[in-house]
Regions:
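Short, Lys/Arg-enriched N-terminal segments with co-localized hydrophobic residues
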Residues: 18-31
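Conserved PLP-enzyme active-site core in the AAT-like
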Residues: 33-35, 47-54, 115-345
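N-terminal "arm"/small-domain region of PLP-dependent enzymes with the aminotransferase-like
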Residues: 33-95, 103-104, 436-441
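PLP-dependent enzyme catalytic core of the Aspartate aminotransferase-like
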Residues: 112, 153-154, 162, 180-183, ...
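Conserved N-terminal alpha-helix of the aminotransferase class I/II PLP-enzyme fold
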Residues: 73-122, 147-155
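Conserved small-domain helix->loop->beta segment predominantly found in fold-type I
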Residues: 306-309, 313-315, 320, 324, ...
Length: 461
């Protein structure tokens, strides 16, 4: 795996004076590129290879709790601001703790560069803002997280960016939704809240045919189970608050640049990356940043101007979670599949919505793209009415009722009245959310305790 220059605020920036690639000054990510290391090793070591210059050769990634950085002299400061020297300028743009986190997630996803921001919502917003503007069009999946759905259908729509929401796994629907001004196809690896699998190859083929950027939210999938870039995605986003952090303790988001879209060849369609940027003296990001143009522009322009910066401390906490991602996800999946088996046979359950079940419409895609399993976040329908669903939830002891997922602790929520309550009846029906829908996020507790807790709650209704 080739991982080079993930950290600096402009990745692989070329000097206008000599055209030579400027290497980052304090973290090298090339040592491990001589050998293909396994996921479990990469999640521990990327960004801290031998030869890196982290504080006092610390084994743990240090927390660089600083707002600004000292320039060596006036020329050094001018070169940093003029993008002739790739390094730290100000804490809103870069930080060495954050740099390790960014490089590690990018490595695990197989991307060329990463950018960490304050939340998953910020990551998605910045990703879309980077290439769409008034008059453009977005095609999005009909099974998105409610916040992403509202961003696309309301917030961006109010800014003159139109949208079409479709079943992206249906080729006819997807192709019919494409317009001349379509800039993005946006989908999730496993849809929220039912973990419906995405047909990566189908969507990728349509995106490539029409020269459209394919963006995937891989929060529910995790790079341990699937790497969307390998299936044709151009950009991957994460809410790092979820599986990456894993403990519900810190907010964060990550954007990973696949480096596989030709911005120069599509400059008229994507002028922010392929044409001169007036806010940087006419610099063309596809030229100065090469394959990492996408995240480089977000860092240099959007993050500079709007400032949804992740804190060094949060980056450190999320790094601690990242180091055990593979171990936790294995346990999440193992437990989830056992819970699915328990629920599908329970007399008080009307239906279980999980792609591992042969009856699920996405089972074929699940078998194709998730050979190691997946979907520890899913829903089921309880028999009865909404009050029965609420009573079931209120009688759980181990499961925490809260608006988060992918914690090591098992979680529960009632989507109809909480996370998806702002959707219309039609939109709720499209996502198969009813008053008796219950969403579970299966944690890493002992499986017998999880099932006993569910059984106890069922006994109370």
């Amino acid at each position: 795996l080739e991982f080079d220059s993930f950290h600096p605020h402009l990745c692989n920036v070329k000097s206008k004076q000599d055209g030579n690639q400027i290497k980052q000054n304090n973290i090298k990510n090339t040592v491990m590129s001589t050998k293909k290391l396994h996921f479990e090793t990469l999640q521990l070591h990327v960004g801290q290879e031998k030869g890196t210059n982290l504080a006092e050769d610390a084994r743990a990634v240090p927390i660089y709790q600083t707002a600004s950085y000292v320039f060596h002299n006036a020329q050094h400061a001018a070169d940093r601001f003029g993008l002739r020297d790739a390094g730290n300028i100000y804490g809103r743009l870069t930080n060495s703790t954050e740099g390790v986190f960014e490089s590690r997630v990018a490595a695990l996803e197989g991307g060329v560069a990463g950018l960490a921001v304050a939340s998953g919502a910020a990551a998605i917003t910045y990703t879309l803002q980077n290439i769409v503007r008034a008059g453009d069009h977005i095609v999005a999946a009909d099974n998105l997280y409610g916040g992403s759905y509202n961003l696309i259908t309301h917030t961006l729509d109010n800014q003159g960016i139109t949208n079409t929401i479709v079943n992206v796994n249906n080729r006819a629907e997807l192709e019919a939704a494409i317009r001349p001004n379509t800039k993005v196809i946006f989908a999730e690896t496993l849809g929220n809240p039912n973990s419906d699998p995405l047909d990566f190859e189908l969507v990728s083929s349509v995106a490539k045919k029409n020269n459209i950027v394919f963006i995937v939210d891989n929060t529910f999938g995790t790079p341990f189970l699937i790497r969307p870039i390998e299936y044709g995605a151009n950009i991957v986003v994460h809410s790092a608050t979820k599986f990456i952090g894993g403990h519900g303790s810190s907010l964060g988001g990550v954007i990973v640049d696949g480096g596989n879209f030709d911005w120069k060849a599509n400059a008229d369609k994507y002028p922010t990356l392929g044409l001169p940027d007036p806010s940087y003296h006419g610099a063309v990001f596809a030229d100065v940043a090469g394959a990492a143009a996408f995240v480089t522009r977000i860092r240099a322009v959007i993050l500079r101007d709007t400032g949804a910066t992740i804190s060094p401390f949060n980056a450190f906490i999320l790094l601690q979670g990242l180091e055990t991602l593979s171990l936790r996800v294995e346990r999440h999946v193992e437990n989830a599949l056992k819970v699915v088996d328990f629920l599908k046979n329970h007399p008080k359950v009307k239906q279980v919505n999980h792609p591992s079940l042969p009856s699920h419409s996405g089972n074929g895609l699940y078998q194709k793209y998730f050979p190691n399993g997946g979907g520890s976040i899913f829903t089921f329908e309880i028999k009865g009415v909404q009050d029965d669903a609420w009573k079931f939830i209120d009688n759980l002891q181990i499961f925490s009722l809260l608006a988060n997922v992918a914690d090591v602790k098992s979680l529960v929520i009632h989507p109809y009245t909480t996370t998806h309550s702002q959707l219309s009846p039609k939109e709720l029906a499209q996502q198969h959310i009813t008053p008796t829908t219950i969403r579970l996020s299966i944690g890493t507790e002992h499986i017998e305790d999880i099932i006993d807790d569910l059984s106890h709650a069922f006994d109370q209704i």
